From Swiss-Prot:
Chain coiled-coil ranges: none
Cofactor field: Mg(2+)
Site residues by UniProt (Transition state stabilizer): H18
Record function comment: Reversibly transfers an adenylyl group from ATP to 4'-phosphopantetheine, yielding dephospho-CoA (dPCoA) and pyrophosphate.
HAMAP family documented for this protein: PPAT_bact
GO cellular component labels: cytoplasm
Superkingdom of the source species: Bacteria
GO biological process entries: coenzyme A biosynthetic process
Subunit structure: Homohexamer.
EC number(s) on file: 2.7.7.3
Phylogenetic lineage: Bacteria, Pseudomonadati, Pseudomonadota, Gammaproteobacteria, Enterobacterales
Subcellular location per the Swiss-Prot or TrEMBL entry: Cytoplasm
Protein name, UniProt field: Phosphopantetheine adenylyltransferase
Positions that bind substrate: T10, K42, L75, R89
Length: 165
């Protein structure tokens, strides 16, 4: 039986930090579903359709990415629907770990077969976050080291299209 893992996130936008986790996970799991959250309480710069498209662009070269999907609702319920019992989570800091441990416990209560596997960020990308990258882009800083080329161009264009206050 193939091991299907889900890597959830907002991916606004997908960064080299995310790709580090995804690439390493492809060496362990047969199939990976990248699940992009459509959390209405989180303010995103890219809409869900754009985030799915950009994530597909950034991961097209990875053969065992089963699909890139958007989702609403509980992650544990998505895992059940997709017949997956593994969540992949990236951890950069002790603060991330503290949050992720609590989330894993809640997901386990909802779906007892669901396990969370934590990937420590590689040191080269451990400081990258989508929020930091967007902040740098907003003020026309150099974001090339943090994003694949296609994502870099999309983010620059997005900030040009948004009127600055």
């Amino acid at each position: 039986m193939k091991k299907i893992a889900i890597y959830p996130g907002t991916f606004d936008p997908i960064t080299y930090g995310h790709l580090d986790v995804i690439t390493r996970a492809t060496k362990i799991f047969d199939n990976i579903i990248i699940a992009i959250s459509n959390n209405v309480h989180k303010k995103t710069i890219f809409n869900l359709k754009e985030r799915i498209k950009l994530t597909k662009l950034a991961t097209f070269h990875l053969k065992n990415i089963k699909k890139v999907i958007g989702f609403n609702g509980l992650l544990a319920n998505l895992a059940k629907r997709e017949k997956s019992n593994i969540l992949i989570r990236g951890v950069r800091t002790i603060f991330d770990f503290d949050y992720e441990i609590k989330l894993a416990a809640i997901n386990k209560q909802i779906y007892p077969d669901l396990d969370s596997i934590f990937f420590l960020s590689s040191k080269e990308v451990s400081f990258i976050s989508s929020s930091f990258v967007k902040e740098i882009a907003k003020y026309q800083g150099n974001i090339k080291p943090y994003l694949p080329k296609e994502i870099h161009f999309a983010l620059i264009k997005k900030f040009k299209d948004i009127p600055q206050k």
